[in-house]
Structures are given as C-alpha cells and as structure tokens.
Amino acid sequence: MYIIAGLGNPGKEYMGTRHNAGFSVIDELADKYNISVDTAKHKGLIGKGVIAGQKVILVKPMTYMNNSGECIREVMDYYKCDIDDFLVIFDDISLDVGKLRLRAKGSAGGHNGIKSIIAHLGSDKFKRIKFGVGDKPKNWDLADWVLGKFPAEEYATLREANKKACEAVECILTDGIESGMNKYNG
C-alpha cells in the first residue's frame, strides 16, 4: 500500500493558492481514479483506492502546512506504512510555475511542511514531487506570495502541470522513483 500526500492548508480561503498545489494534485488524482478523499481521520482527509494497480491512500493533512507531519505520522503508523511507500507532493518557489522536480529524498529546503514531516518521521528519505509555483517578486513577503492565488493567465499551465504530476505519480508507482526522475525532471 502506498500513501500519497499532497500538502496545503484547509479552508476555502486557501483554495487556489500557491501553497495548496499539493492539494490540487491530490484532487486531480482523486477525480481521475474515482477516489473520494472525504474521510476525516488522523488529522486529515483520506481516501482509499487503486492507482496504476497499486492500493493507495490519498491524504490531505488538515493541520495547516507547518504541522503536516502530525497527520502524516498518524497515517503512516495506523496503516503500518514503510517510508519507502510514502510520496508527498508540495509547492516549490524555486521552480517556474508548472515545472515538476522529483526527488527520492532530501532536506526541507526551507519548506515548513516538509520540515514538519521530516521531524515527525525522523527521516528525510521519502519520495517527493515538487510542484513549481514560481519565485516571489522582489519586495514581496514570502507568506503573502505562497498564500496568494495564481493569476488567471497561469490556469492553463497549472491544468497541464496537474495532469503531468498525476502521470509522474503513476510512473513512480509502476516503474519507481528513478524512472520518474529521468522522465519528469526537465
């Protein structure tokens, strides 16, 4: 069984924000594979289903970004999931809008949600898909940038990136992270 988490913040006011890119990919996967991510459990919303022949649990932590690790730890413990079978999708300001970067492991890179997951799991050796949201303009506050909504002219790019992220998840599940990195890291 694979646990696939997308990071974001709960609440309508955060829908469509850069920080909720992970939630958007989970929603896209849920739609594509008819998985209802609506069971409130383990400080998150979860849904069970099958993607690319693998049993999966899709997770949207409801702890707010900076405490995402609380939810992930509870889900991992409850389902007795090994860290090798965990994948997280999250926003990355160091990548252009819609660009993806897959990694097998790594530091938090300044991302508080990932920092929380590393702290709660006691390891940084988990797979991840970084979803590019673009760097903040000069003189902008970082929080204002990541909590801001994407402009309408980026919607088409985001739709394509969501589809590409779903394909990357499928690739990881069927062929492994190395294959995914070779195919999707541009």
Curated annotation (Swiss-Prot):
Catalytic residues in the record: 19
Residues the UniProt record annotates as site (Stabilizes the basic form of H active site to accept a proton): 91
Site (Discriminates between blocked and unblocked aminoacyl-tRNA): 9
Pfam family, one: Pept_tRNA_hydro
Disulfide bonds: none
Principal location class: cytoplasm
Any one GO cellular component localisation term in the record: cytoplasm
Protein name: Peptidyl-tRNA hydrolase
Naturally occurring in which organism (per UniProt): Lachnospira eligens (strain ATCC 27750 / DSM 3376 / VPI C15-48 / C15-B4)
Gene responsible for this protein: pth
Family recorded in the similarity comment: Belongs to the PTH family.
